[in-house]
Amino acid sequence: NQRKMVDSINKNDILFAIGPAGTGKTYTAVALAVRALRNKEIKRIILTRPAVEAGENLGFLPGDLKEKVDPYLRPLYDALDDMIPAEKLKGYLENRTIEVAPLAFMRGRTLDNCFVILDEAQNATDMQLKMFLTRMGPTAKFIVTGDLTQVDLPKKNQSGLSTAIKILDNISGIDIVYLTGSDVVRHKLVRRILEAYGDLNNN
């Protein structure tokens, strides 16, 4: 199904990749963005994720904004580290060819001539996801990744991701790819763990 992601983004401008931890959805999305940058199909990569997760609010974290935000964005940096030599990546980040920022920073912008990845989108509210998707400029590609079994939003907030995949399913140019436990690319035990928790949740 990672192959489906590759085929889909070649044909569509917005791709939702939905699946459990370890299925390589974020890694594949970042690889596709790096490929597009190398092929000069786009000028910039923007990686973002909601910065409120697991009950933590940025207001309660110590340090300046970069220090506060970076722990949330670490998995995106990790994927980039695997694909781009350290010095080159440093240069890209400094000249903003690659930007890694929390979702709130997308408000009011038009994201054009770039490849944009929203990771952990299950933790975006309806309003946040609508705000994000409507930032899209005419020559942008968007990949939205998420796992609907790992929603960290307060109970009163429904995941914007579950709403989006229901209401946007039949729009031309938008595709939804579902990854499953069989797509897990981490240690073989990860799939077994996910299956065990799935059994627990179903009982």
Write out the residue ranges for each language-model feature.
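Conserved helicase motor core of SF1/SF2 NTP-dependent helicases
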Residues: 2-18, 22-23, 27-118, 122-203
